[in-house]
């Protein structure tokens, strides 16, 4: 067909238009930019006022409720970790439905006028089991996590690719509301492998996340944790340090504190973390007034339903409870603490002119139910589905189990009084002989043996082991297998011939068990019913029980433990029925009491009797603390005097953990002895010592508490910390103290023990400070 000149001109123009349209579709408009010291979103400069909240820790039915409360407090952004092990519980099998539908959570945030900062890890910490890693990674015993191990990176890539399919369409450049994506998480507190960081960064880009990337680290760890092409941000840093640190890597900012801590998380057996609102509100005010973008960790903590809590090992093995209330502005059940209203007042001062915040939604209704007694029981074996025969013990990971419990059974052939040793117990064990419970062992106290008297043989030995939470922070994430991870000895004999049954009870259909007469004194399930007239949030009071887990209408509320501080379990209103409701309790440590009730307020700060604690016993610390040059706050020499000595820090330091390291003594015995220490805040005031807690001590004179590390801050100058004189040791000696709150410290005061002829008169010391937990190496 012959074409004239006009036809050709029209075709050329059409081709240009089509090419432009294709180009426009394939290259979305850049809606978020970082430059000139600011964040620019949709053409406008913005100060990010952000809060962290986690979709698995909030009932799906309450996502919108919590997001509305975030917007009403003044937040313009929410930050959210993505939990790998919540989506890929078995290799290659992904779940993004229901409670795991993070895309719906993000779209709901957009509908409520909130941007989203995505934190996909793959490692996330978050006081979550294994820091978000799936437990099946542990099957490959020689694989190294958070490294360039090719096998590990291949699993990371599969996960991130799948995440990209689900979430990359929701970036702001694709019409959604995801404005930034984080690369890894606090990596500088773990290692400094730039190749590994670059690999994770590139995976995120290749997965389609076409928005700015960032890293987050403590102030002294940015060098190790930062990667090219990602904005460096800070965790736990306050004041002028924000500018000093960031300017080393990105002169002029923008400045973003990706984790600002209004409070802290809890652990089993310790008091509930509670921080008054005044100081955090002042810190928030300072940051906003100085143009710093900020994300509060947490804005709303929520709940570790099922068995998802993690554990730390900084001060011994420290598992976290079911409640992740965090003493955040918005409490576990969506309640507004005074901190919420104080923060709202601060934020309102910095909103654009004419901006009116939404009204704070009314409190959600609560309900109660009367005391009920659970009279029906089912034996532990009701949950036995698949038993494996093995010559040697196997771990939970060997059997493909992520959470819950594992049951071991064998036969004892030798009678008499012998020591039963469970090597590398992870984490809590109940021991039965011929069906009778005879002992329990607790990893928190490094308990791994008990002496038993077996009068008749053969005798049946049963060991029920609970995974109370995989380590989520520090080098110990490499040692996270659960159950019995080595061997069991009876006297000097290694026990063999095991029947092993995994019990991942969080997905157990407890309602279908056959219940009958009550069972006492051994692990068992107990069932009852209660009635509510109207649905409302409720708190199941488990303070009369020992240790176990609860289901209501088939929904797993998580675990309880009467040592506290948590004594209630949160029961969300959507999981209740008007009228009769079924409750099932698994009791691992039976108290003989079968009563419970529903309250309209939680009990989060009530310590009970810890049956495994022995007087004078300190939590078993695993490893040696790593002290980094970036955390060194003061290096000085003490005078040979008994008077108080004061030292200004060269630079005021933001810290929560601080370490006293002795390097030399005036005496020649290599001992160390100090009577009392004080820290002075940035306003020149002594910091309250009533909440301080020792999390590590390299040596102490523990006999009759004569020279324990707690004497350093007991307010009594006649008491003292003294290294163990009965054990030969050299400097350095170290004590690490948790202040339980982040402070800006300007000075250090110390008083050595009074007396002329005393051992351990300290001469040279270092003081280290970290806003985050101390890390350790084995």
Positions of the model-derived regions?
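Extended substrate-binding grooves/exosites of carbohydrate-active enzymes
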Residues: 30, 34-62, 68-72, 93, ...
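Catalytic domains of carbohydrate-active enzymes, especially glycoside hydrolases
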Residues: 62-83, 101, 112-117
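Aromatic-lined carbohydrate-recognition surfaces of secreted/lumenal glycan-active proteins
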Residues: 119-121, 172-185, 203-224, 230-236, ...
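Carbohydrate-binding surfaces of carbohydrate-active enzymes
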Residues: 156-182, 193-194, 201, 209-210, ...
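Disordered, acidic Ser/Thr/Pro-rich linker "stalks" and the adjacent N-terminal cap
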Residues: 386-391, 553, 619-655, 666-745, ...
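Extended extracellular/luminal ectodomain segments enriched in beta-structured repeat modules
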Residues: 413-419, 532-539, 652-657, 730-732, ...
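Aromatic-lined ligand-binding clefts that engage carbohydrates, nucleic acids, or primary amines
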Residues: 418-432, 461, 530-553, 560-561, ...
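Short beta-strand-plus-loop segments that form exposed binding edges in beta-rich domains
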Residues: 463-469, 585-591, 661-668, 753
């Amino acid at each position: 067909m012959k074409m004239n000149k006009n036809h050709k001109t029209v075709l050329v123009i059409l081709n240009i238009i089509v090419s432009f349209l294709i180009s426009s579709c394939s290259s979305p408009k850049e809606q978020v930019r970082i430059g000139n010291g600011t964040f620019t979103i949709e053409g406008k400069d913005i100060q990010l006022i952000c809060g962290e909240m986690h979709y698995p820790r909030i009932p799906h039915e309450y996502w919108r409720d919590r997001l509305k409360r975030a917007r009403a407090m003044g937040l313009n952004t929410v930050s959210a970790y993505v939990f790998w092990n919540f989506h890929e519980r078995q290799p290659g099998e992904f779940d993004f439905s229901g409670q795991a539908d993070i895309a719906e959570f993000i779209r709901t945030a957009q509908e409520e006028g909130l941007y989203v900062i995505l934190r996909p890890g793959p490692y996330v910490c978050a006081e979550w089991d294994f820091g978000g890693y799936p437990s099946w990674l542990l099957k490959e015993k020689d694989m190294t996590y958070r490294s360039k191990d090719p096998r590990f990176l291949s699993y990371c890539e599969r996960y991130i690719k799948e995440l990209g399919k689900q979430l990359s369409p929701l970036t702001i450049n694709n019409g959604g509301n995801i404005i930034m994506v984080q690369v890894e998480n606090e990596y500088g507190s773990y290692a400094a492998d730039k190749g590994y960081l670059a690999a994770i960064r590139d995976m995120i880009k290749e997965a389609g996340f076409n928005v700015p990337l960032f890293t987050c680290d403590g102030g002294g760890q940015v060098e190790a944790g930062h990667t090219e092409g990602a904005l460096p941000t800070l965790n736990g840093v306050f004041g002028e340090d924000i500018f000093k640190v960031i300017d080393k890597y990105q002169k002029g900012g923008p400045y973003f504190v990706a984790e600002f801590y209004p409070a802290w998380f809890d652990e089993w057996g310790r008091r509930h973390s509670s921080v008054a609102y005044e100081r955090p509100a002042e810190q928030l005010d300072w940051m906003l007034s100085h143009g710093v973008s900020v994300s509060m960790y947490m804005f709303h903590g929520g709940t570790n339903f099922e068995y998802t809590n993690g554990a730390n090992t900084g001060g011994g093995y420290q598992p976290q409870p079911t409640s992740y209330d965090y003493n955040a502005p918005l409490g576990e059940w969506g309640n507004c603490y005074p901190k919420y209203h104080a923060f709202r007042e601060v934020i309102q001062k910095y909103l654009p002119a004419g901006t009116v915040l939404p009204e704070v939604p009314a409190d959600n209704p609560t309900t109660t139910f009367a005391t009920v007694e659970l009279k029906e029981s089912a034996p532990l074996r009701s949950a036995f589905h698949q038993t494996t025969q093995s010559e040697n013990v196997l771990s939970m990971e060997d059997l493909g189990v992520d959470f819950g419990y594992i049951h071991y059974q064998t036969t004892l052939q030798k009678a008499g009084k012998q020591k039963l040793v469970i090597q590398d117990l992870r984490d809590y064990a109940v021991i039965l002989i011929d069906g009778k419970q005879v002992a329990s062992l607790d990893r928190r106290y490094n308990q791994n043996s008990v002496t038993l008297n077996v009068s008749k043989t053969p005798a049946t030995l049963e060991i029920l082991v609970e995974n109370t939470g995989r380590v989520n922070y520090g080098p110990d994430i490499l040692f996270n297998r659960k159950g019995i991870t080595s061997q069991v000895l009876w006297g000097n004999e290694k026990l063999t011939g095991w029947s092993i049954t995994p019990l991942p009870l969080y997905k157990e259909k407890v309602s279908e068990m056959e219940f009958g007469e009550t069972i006492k004194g051994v692990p068992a399930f107990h069932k009852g019913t209660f009635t509510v007239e109207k649905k409302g949030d409720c708190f199941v009071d488990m303070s009369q029980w020992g240790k176990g887990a609860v289901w209501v209408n088939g929904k797993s509320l998580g675990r309880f433990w009467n040592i506290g501080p948590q004594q209630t379990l949160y029961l969300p209103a959507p999981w209740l029925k008007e009228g009769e409701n079924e409750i099932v309790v698994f009791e691992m440590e039976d108290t003989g009491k079968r009563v419970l009730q529903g309250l309209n307020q939680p009990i989060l700060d009530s310590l009970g009797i810890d049956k495994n604690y022995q007087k004078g016993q300190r939590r078993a610390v695993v490893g040696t603390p790593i002290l980094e040059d970036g955390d060194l706050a003061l290096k000085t020499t003490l005078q040979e005097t008994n008077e108080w000595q004061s030292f200004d820090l060269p630079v005021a330091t933001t810290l929560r953990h601080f370490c006293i390291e002795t390097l030399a003594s005036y005496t020649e015995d290599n001992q160390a002895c100090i009577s009392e220490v004080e820290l002075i805040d940035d306003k020149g005031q002594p910091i309250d010592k009533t909440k301080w807690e020792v999390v590590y001590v390299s040596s102490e004179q523990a006999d009759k508490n004569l020279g324990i590390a707690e004497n350093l801050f007991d307010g009594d100058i006649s008491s003292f910390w003294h290294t163990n004189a009965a054990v030969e040791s050299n400097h350095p000696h170290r004590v690490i103290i948790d202040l339980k709150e982040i402070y800006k410290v300007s000075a250090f005061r110390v008083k050595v023990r009074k007396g002329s002829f005393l051992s351990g008169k300290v001469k040279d010391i270092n003081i280290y400070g970290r806003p985050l937990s101390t890390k350790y190496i084995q």
